[in-house]
Amino acid sequence: MRIRGGKNRGRELRALKSDHIRPPLERVRQTIFAILAERAEGANVLDLFAGTGSLGLEALSRGARRVLFVDNSAQSVRALKGNIAACRMEAQTAVMMMSAFQIFNSRRLHDAGPYDIIFADPPYPLLDMPRGLGRFLRLLDRLVEEGLLAPDGRVVARCRPGVMRLEELQQLESVRAEQVGDTEVFFLKRKTRAQ
């Protein structure tokens, strides 16, 4: 797995093999950053369910100002910290080992926000369970309710095709959706409220 663009283009990243860890394929990351384009430049980024950090590190390579990574797996966090060091991006990053569902209790996370880009890339098995999908959709809405998403920010959510239920989101709406192989990527923004 390699970084696809920016100052660290071609840099090899360590990946883990697991049913719960699925780093986005390079072509998925290419699609994401082709759509985000200049949004990454200077962005404050939150990478939830970060795994080994390929999305956040790609954002940094393409000019993001700072990335806060969140993952609850000790194995993933070790690999992530190794990838950050290999890219020499320690000064632009912070890593929190915790569940993405518990971030709203973190003062540090709130103080570092709001975020221009939030990556939300949960394990597919979580979204395959009705309760898990409901928790994930609630998490996405709370990002807006808690003031973590910047006013013109984007949430980039990745899941298996046909899983996402956009109609259940109260605070976010889709700007664009792309399917790349067995992955569907949603670009979400705050819902526009009628005046």
Residue ranges of predicted features:
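Class I S-adenosyl-L-methionine-dependent methyltransferase catalytic core
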Residues: 1-195
